[in-house]
């Protein structure tokens, strides 16, 4: 699956949906399973801002080898944006794939997206804006993060933070404490993985994950885009992409 050309006749299509409540028993806005076959999600909005965080899980999740193309879709006001990979049963996921094209993920706590357990994620022309916001923050924050053998590649994407203290000073302390705890439990000795605040984690990898990026933009010097190669997108082009997607993905 390489783009919005679709899932094929044996797959599932979810389109033109405005989702304001979790539609799965686990609290997800949309859940994709490997047994669904290739799935296309297009022209959808997942906005769970009216629901308390304790009743929610992911905006969009993919488990058990899920394969999906998500295009022209907005995920907003959720605690956890997009998760690909089943942490409980990682052996089911090595064939899982996710393509995000022309999408907006904004005003979330974390996972924009998170990839784990060997899954492969490709992001094209996406805007990731304001992760770690106080209203959706729980224990830690990050935007795109690959770990445990997973990979994320970002092409022509924008990573944008309006503020550094998105969840206030207390949120920053809680976030750092939880990252330190995570790294301690995983016996990760890289000090950057311990001490980088979540609001700075634009595109990162740890614990055997890999990330790469080309022609991406970040609006703050402190946003980390690991694995970026070549020239970056300019501010004018980034603002144009943001305006285009905001205008289309209402």
PLM segments and residue spans:
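Short "repeat-start/strand-capping" segments in structured domains, especially the N-termini
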Residues: 10, 36-37, 65-67, 96, ...
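Extracellular beta-strand/beta-solenoid scaffold signature
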Residues: 1-6, 23-33, 52-63, 77-95, ...
